[in-house]
From Swiss-Prot:
This is Cytochrome c oxidase assembly protein COX11, mitochondrial. Residues 110-282 are mitochondrial intermembrane. Pfam families: CtaG_Cox11. The lineage of its organism: Eukaryota, Metazoa, Chordata, Craniata, Vertebrata. It comes from Bos taurus. GO terms for cellular component: mitochondrial inner membrane; protein-containing complex. Exerts its effect at some terminal stage of cytochrome c oxidase synthesis, probably by being involved in the insertion of the copper B into subunit I. GO terms for biological process: ATP biosynthetic process; intracellular monoatomic cation homeostasis. The gene is COX11.
Length: 282
């Protein structure tokens, strides 16, 4: 602390005891003194005080604390390598799972629809029908059901698609006819193909379609507009199913997707291997 205090100007000796009084501290000492108090101890306070005194300097690289050397223990190195290998394996499995889930999301929709078409489960209407059965059906007049219609278009298809009627009323055992309208507002021919669904799901096994445009390629030229009929009936057994007691509303929903020319699909619900093609459009 040399140079921080002025020389003593008074010294008293009394009975072997000496006492001296220092002069006033210099300005440098006044600036550094708060940083060098015991309460300000530590690297930050000491460095700040030395900076104010002008005696601080940055430590050289040789004075820096030595970094921790890499472990030379063979066991530790093998353990670190094992951890890295495990991390790579986990990342590989995660990437494979993500790709698998993406592929399953694309494949699940058509497979699920084909399953529902064949079994009549999951809210899909049954496509199979027999002419004798239709002719011999007995309508259940006291069981009135409201049928509503919905239309959707996939983002890849630039069509205008809508039902021509919002609702109709039918009874089990009675045939009904409804229409949808589709238009191609683009300047090029577009081929579309549709799927359908029935809500509530439990009513799908009783919803029978005699004639419709589903699973068939529909080619529309630029600015062309067509009407698409749906001929269907509700099976009379609908009125005998206790699960359908509170079902008075059924919704038939169609969704159109863009299809490639020449694409064919098997007709669900039929025992034959008949396929639909553009020539069989309704």
């Amino acid at each position: 602390m040399g140079g921080l205090w002025r020389p003593a100007w008074r010294r008293v000796v009394f009975c072997g005891w000496s006492w001296s009084h220092l002069g006033r501290p210099t300005r440098a000492a006044e600036r550094a003194e708060p940083c060098l108090r015991p309460g300000r101890s530590g690297p930050a306070g000491t460095e700040q005080g030395l900076r104010r005194l002008g005696t601080w300097r940055r430590p050289s690289p040789a004075e820096q604390p030595a970094r921790r050397p890499k472990s030379t223990n063979p066991y530790t190195r093998s353990q670190e390598e094992d951890w890295r290998r495990r991390n790579k394996t986990v990342l590989t499995y995660m990437a494979a799972a993500a790709v698998g889930m993406l592929g399953a999301s694309y494949a699940a929709v058509p497979l699920y629809r084909l399953y529902c078409q064949t079994t009549g489960l999951g809210g899909s209407a049954v496509a199979g029908h027999a002419s004798d059965q239709i002719e011999n059906m007995v309508p259940v007049k006291d069981r009135i059901i409201k049928i509503t219609f919905n239309a959707d278009v996939h983002a890849s298809l630039q069509w205008n698609f809508r039902p021509q009627q919002t609702e109709i009323y039918v009874v089990p055992g009675e045939t009904a006819l409804a229409f949808y309208k589709a238009k191609n507002p683009t300047d090029k021919p577009v081929i579309g193909i549709s799927t359908y669904n029935v809500v509530p799901f439990e009513a799908g096994q009783y919803f029978n379609k005699i004639q419709c445009f589903c699973f068939e390629e529909q080619r529309l030229n630029p600015q062309e507009e067509v009407d698409m009929p749906v001929f269907f009936y509700i099976d009379p057994e609908f009125a005998e199913d206790p699960r359908m007691v509170n079902v008075d509303l059924i919704t038939l929903s169609y969704t159109f997707f863009e299809a490639k020319e020449g694409h064919t699909l098997p007709v669900p619900g039929y025992n034959s291997n008949q396929q639909l093609s553009p020539a069989s459009n309704l």
